[in-house]
Amino acid sequence: MSTYRRVLLKLSGESLGGPAGKGIDEKWLAAYAEEVAEAVKNGLQVAIVIGGGNIFRGLQGVGKGFDRVNGDKLGMLATVINSLGLAMAIRSAGVEAEVFTATPMMPVARYYMRDDAV
């Protein structure tokens, strides 16, 4: 048993895309979910921060005519898409999962409030 009760896992969005680094590769998603589920079943509380680079990067949009702010907004939505996919995979592995966002997006995800997340 680990000496830690809570861990933070940072995943690159590109890692969900498998070898190509694009889109969502279901095999990689399931593999991450199984690892997280195993950790939770062994008594760990796991928080996950995930990127959205497999879908869209704000800086890439600037080179394609997007202004930086709207490009970053697209990147944030990509992060939510990845979060929802990973949460579904974790639930399929038999563990509860919740998606929180700093921007209200009901009913897509819960608005982050510290007391709800801890």
PLM feature spans:
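General beta-strand structural signal in soluble alpha/beta enzymes
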Residues: 9, 47-51, 97-102
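Short low-complexity stretches enriched in small and charged residues
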Residues: 2-7, 52-57, 83-84
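Short, active-site-adjacent cap segments at secondary-structure transitions
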Residues: 15-17, 53-58, 106-107
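N-terminal active-site beta-alpha-beta segment that forms phosphate/nucleotide-binding
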Residues: 38-40, 45-46, 52-59, 74-77
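N-terminal glycine-/serine-/threonine-rich phosphate-binding loop
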Residues: 1-47
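A generic, residue-level signal for flexible/boundary positions that often mark functional hotspots
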Residues: 10, 18, 50, 68, ...
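Ligand-binding beta-strand-loop-alpha-helix segment within the catalytic cores
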Residues: 61-118
